[in-house]
């Protein structure tokens, strides 16, 4: 019984030490693209729905969203609104025409995490893409597809 208790205590201490290991402030993953995919979406297409559809159709597990252009009739995104963790968020949404001047982000284990930048003659706005951003003319998005064996689901988790 004493031996079991000693092993149990050492096990618990080991878990505590492992949990307290410092995660590096900078984490680097090296890879190459398997392929480049260019996705075109027609007028009235929802950008996030279209990206998710392309990910499913082309069986994309991991990718870098390299570029995106187009124009919108409606937009919806979210932005952080304070310095706390987890941060408070605001969800701007409007039905106005704007140019889509960039899309970038990642596909992490099949999950789209995209940010958009929009402009008109007076302002530039943007944030984390939400459903409801719809094409006026078209969207073109370029994805650099990465190997499936990369494990970086955690990259966009602030708790990591």
Regions found by a protein language model. Name each.
Residues 20-45, 49-56, 62-67, 73-113, ...:
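N-terminal intrinsically disordered, cationic/polar leader segments
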Residues 4-13:
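Sec-dependent N-terminal signal peptides
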Residues 15-19:
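Sec/Tat signal peptide C-region and signal peptidase I cleavage site
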């Amino acid at each position: 019984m004493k031996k079991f208790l000693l092993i149990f205590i050492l096990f618990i201490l080991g878990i505590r030490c492992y949990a307290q290991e410092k995660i590096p402030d900078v984490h680097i993953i090296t890879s190459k693209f398997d392929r480049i995919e260019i996705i075109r979406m027609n007028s009235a297409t929802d950008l996030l729905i279209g990206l998710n559809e392309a990910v499913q159709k082309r069986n994309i597990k991991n990718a870098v969203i390299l570029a995106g252009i187009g124009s919108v009739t409606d937009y919806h995104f979210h932005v952080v609104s304070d310095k706390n963790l987890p941060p408070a968020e605001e969800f701007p949404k409007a039905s106005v025409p704007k140019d889509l001047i960039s899309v970038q982000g990642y596909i992490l284990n099949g999950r789209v995490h995209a940010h958009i930048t929009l402009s008109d003659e007076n302002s530039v706005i943007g944030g984390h893409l939400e459903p409801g951003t719809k094409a006026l003319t078209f969207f073109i998005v370029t994805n650099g597809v990465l190997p499936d064996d990369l494990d970086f689901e955690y990259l966009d988790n602030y708790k990591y």
